[in-house]
Amino acid sequence: MASVASSTVFASSLPHHRATTRAPPTPPRIPRRARLPGRSVVSCLPKRGSEKLVVTRASDEEGPPEPAGQGRGGGRAWPSLDASSCGLALAAAAGVLMLQGSQQALAGTEFMGMQDVVGDLGDISTGFASAFLLIFFSELGDRTFFIAALLAARNSGAIIFLGTFGALAVMTIISVVLGRAFHYVDGIIPFSFGGTDFPVDDFLAACLLVYYGITTLLDAASGDEEKMNEEQEEAELAVSKFLGNGAGIISAASTIASTFVLVFIAEWGDKSFFSTIALAAASSPLGVIAGSLAGHAVATLIAVLGGSLLGTFLSEKIVAYIGGSLFLAFAAVTLVEIVNS
């Protein structure tokens, strides 16, 4: 009986193994600590009364200050590397601000320099319209117009158009460059009148436009066609010399080159040459170039397709009156701009 009781007591002291698995132990709760301050430029600035720029991690629990120079593990402070990081952030921010300021200053300087060359970009449409109307009505019935018409009657119209328009395009670019150079020199050496800067280039351009406007209207009001006949006779003489040389009509390239030289010489110092200089000095050169090229292209195309038919649809006097009126109108606009400025 005693043996049975002892065995029972020994069995009851043994651990009982259950079939179910035991849940994992709950980890101990870590006390909540204060959030690290952000590494912004403002947080890097030293506070009043602080001697060292060291960012520490605060604890919810009160206690003695934690030693510096320890790691993240046991609630320890960040090393002094944060001070150098803040210094780099400040230096980077200052560098970015200085770079932006220098770029803006450089862009402003380059824009002012380009504006002296290309003029006011907002005045392109006005310069285009003025140059187109002025060149178109100036070239109708001009010596260059008759030269293109006479050459097209004896050669291919496309070849004559290329040679004529090429010469007029080069002449236009030269005129605009001269006008813009005069405007640039006037900006460097200003002329003072009454205590204010007086735009000499715009004034001379207006005077030149007035001169051509008055002479064109006087030729139209004279009642005879001597001026137009003189232009046509000069064109016929130039074309006869061109054809008499025999240089040229051998190939398309030689014909284009000969036409280019003939028109370039005839156009040099012409009324449209000086009027383009005047417009470029007072208006946007980009608009003047585009408008002049468009006006030359349309007038040359009319001359090549059938310049002799122009008189059946449009009177020579009407063309002269329109051209002279445009010269005076553009001169008046230039003078008004001078007064307003």
From Swiss-Prot:
It is a multi-pass membrane protein. GO terms for cellular component: chloroplast membrane; chloroplast thylakoid membrane; Golgi apparatus. It is found in: Plastid, Chloroplast membrane. The chain crosses the membrane at residues 79-99, 117-137, 158-178, 203-223, 246-266, 286-306, 318-338. Residues 1-13 have a biased composition (Low complexity). InterPro entries: GDT1-like. PANTHER family: PROTEIN PAM71, CHLOROPLASTIC (PTHR12608:SF6), TRANSMEMBRANE PROTEIN HTP-1 RELATED (PTHR12608). This is GDT1-like protein 1, chloroplastic. The lineage of its organism: Eukaryota, Viridiplantae, Streptophyta, Embryophyta, Tracheophyta.
